[in-house]
């Protein structure tokens, strides 16, 4: 009795250079969560830039008119209005939070299935969005008042005289609304990453 098995050798040229068509399946379960975490980090960096730009732009908003009298100098500055002061402080807090949240976003990339950092980010992002929206809404009301005035109160708009001041303030408000939109999108991404599937 022989334990020998004869296997015919295929010596054709076509069979020698081909590899088997069966590939190993390396599908990682939850791979989309890592992709969401990377997208979260990129958006978070964008939100830092826009929130910081809004705070810095409003904080440097001032204009002095070239004409003045012996007793008066006509000047407009962000610290003349408490609403703009609140805007600068609130946007600085939001941008500071966003910088401090970057390590948690990196942890979410390294450990995409961890729910603790995601839950913390979704709660604090909601607080930051609320503060950002409050500051932006208050500032847009003052910018509108500066541009159009209020005929009922007999207030005239000042943007005809202080054009640079109004332009910089409007730019800061637009940047803050962009930051609010990015924060809202970050909350949606965190909610998607917290799903069980």
From Swiss-Prot:
Transmembrane region(s): 36-56, 86-106, 120-140, 172-192
Record keyword Cell membrane present: yes
Extracellular side: 57-85, 141-171
InterPro entries: CASP/CASPL, CASP_dom, CASPL
Known glycosylation sites: 150
Keywords tagged on the record: Cell membrane, Cell wall biogenesis/degradation, Glycoprotein, Membrane, Transmembrane, Transmembrane helix
Places the protein is found: Cell membrane
Glycoprotein keyword on record: yes
Membrane topology: Multi-pass membrane protein
Primary residence: membrane
GO cellular component: Casparian strip; plasma membrane
Regions of this protein lying in the Cytoplasmic compartment: 1-35, 107-119, 193-197
GO biological process, alphabetically ordered: cell wall modification; cell-cell junction assembly
Subunit structure, as described in the record: Homodimer and heterodimers.
Protein role: Regulates membrane-cell wall junctions and localized cell wall deposition. Required for establishment of the Casparian strip membrane domain (CSD) and the subsequent formation of Casparian strips, a cell wall modification of the root endodermis that determines an apoplastic barrier between the intraorganismal apoplasm and the extraorganismal apoplasm and prevents lateral diffusion.
UniProt cross-references to PANTHER family, sorted A to Z: CASP-LIKE PROTEIN (PTHR36488:SF11), CASP-LIKE PROTEIN 1U1 (PTHR36488)
Family: Belongs to the Casparian strip membrane proteins (CASP) family.
Protein name: Casparian strip membrane protein 3
Organism the protein comes from: Populus trichocarpa
């Amino acid at each position: 009795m022989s334990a020998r098995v004869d296997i015919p050798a295929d010596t054709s040229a076509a069979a020698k250079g081909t590899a088997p068509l069966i590939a190993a399946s390396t599908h990682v379960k939850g791979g989309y969560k890592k992709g969401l975490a990377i997208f979260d980090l990129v958006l978070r960096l964008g939100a830092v830039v826009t929130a910081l730009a809004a705070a810095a732009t409003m904080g440097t908003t001032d204009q002095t008119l070239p004409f003045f009298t012996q007793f008066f100098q006509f000047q407009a500055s962000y610290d003349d209005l408490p609403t703009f002061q609140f805007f600068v402080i609130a946007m600085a807090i939001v941008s500071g939070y966003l910088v401090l949240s970057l390590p948690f976003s990196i942890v979410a990339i390294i450990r995409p299935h961890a729910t603790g950092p995601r839950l913390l980010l979704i709660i604090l992002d909601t607080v930051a969005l609320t503060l950002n929206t409050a500051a932006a809404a208050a500032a847009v009301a003052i910018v509108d008042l500066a541009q159009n005035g209020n005929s009922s109160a007999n207030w005239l708009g000042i943007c005809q005289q202080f054009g640079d001041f109004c332009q910089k303030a409007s730019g800061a408000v637009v940047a803050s609304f962009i930051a609010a939109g990015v924060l809202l999108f970050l909350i949606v991404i965190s909610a998607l990453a917290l799903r069980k599937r």
